Amino acid sequence: MNTQTALRLGVNIDHIATIRQARGTPYPDLVEAVRIVEEAGADIITLHLREDRRHIQDRDVEMLRERITTGMNLEMAATEEMQAIALRIRPQACCIVPERREELTTEGGLDVLGQEARLKAFCAPLLAAGIEVSLFVEPDLAHLDAALRIGAPVVELHTGAYASAAPGPDREAHLERIVAAAAHGHARGLVVNAGHGLDYENVLPIAAIPVMHELNIGHAIVARALFTGIGEAVRAMRAAMDRARR
């Protein structure tokens, strides 16, 4: 029996906003960027409203909620402020991530084991509002089991350690953890996504995991867009993911 699921591409637009915020200009226009990204094959648009507002701004979330035609995946910390924003904006999906002001980017998965009760209470009103809630977790079986107890229907596996490892035994070991975690979560009814640090090469083994549902990728796509344009960068990532599934 073929258990392979259709693989979705979530394009993270944070670093398009980073370029805008570097000079405080009205460009690049995120609405136009999203239009091109969606036409090029993105299945969902991901954006992270950080507490320090270093790239995505509140007005972006409000405006894009009305303009995105595929779906909005709002990444956010588990704070009262972010919960209130999500309940007001009602994105199609939200991903709960850990956050530290001094980090350059999200550095790891949520400590779901250490704050299980808190996360369950945090997620409950989001789920009740019809928002698809995912938890950004390490590829660890105990964390996936905790996500189930919390009630989140989706997990996003943190691929940062895999992506940062040099090709060879170390990266293979990280890949094996991700494969095992994906199978474990899928067997227990979780929808399994993945993301962080994925590029046009290291995405291939992750995309090849049969039960993987969605990959969220941003920095590599925006970096390639400097040379090819954002539409072609998205199409190239979509093509790489499709090759891995053949």
UniProtKB/Swiss-Prot annotation:
A GO biological-process term: pyridoxine biosynthetic process
Pfam families: PdxJ (PF03740)
Site positions (Transition state stabilizer): 156
Keyword Cytoplasm: yes
Binding locations of 1-deoxy-D-xylulose 5-phosphate: 14-15, 50, 55, 105
Binding site for 3-amino-2-oxopropyl phosphate: 12, 23, 197, 218-219
One GO cellular component term: cytosol
UniProtKB keywords: Cytoplasm, Pyridoxine biosynthesis, Transferase
Subcellular location: Cytoplasm
SS bond list: none
EC number: 2.6.99.2
Keyword Cytoplasm: yes
Functional note: Catalyzes the complicated ring closure reaction between the two acyclic compounds 1-deoxy-D-xylulose-5-phosphate (DXP) and 3-amino-2-oxopropyl phosphate (1-amino-acetone-3-phosphate or AAP) to form pyridoxine 5'-phosphate (PNP) and inorganic phosphate.
UniProt name for this protein: Pyridoxine 5'-phosphate synthase
UniProt source species: Thioalkalivibrio sulfidiphilus (strain HL-EbGR7)
Source lineage: Bacteria, Pseudomonadati, Pseudomonadota, Gammaproteobacteria, Chromatiales
Gene designation per UniProt: pdxJ
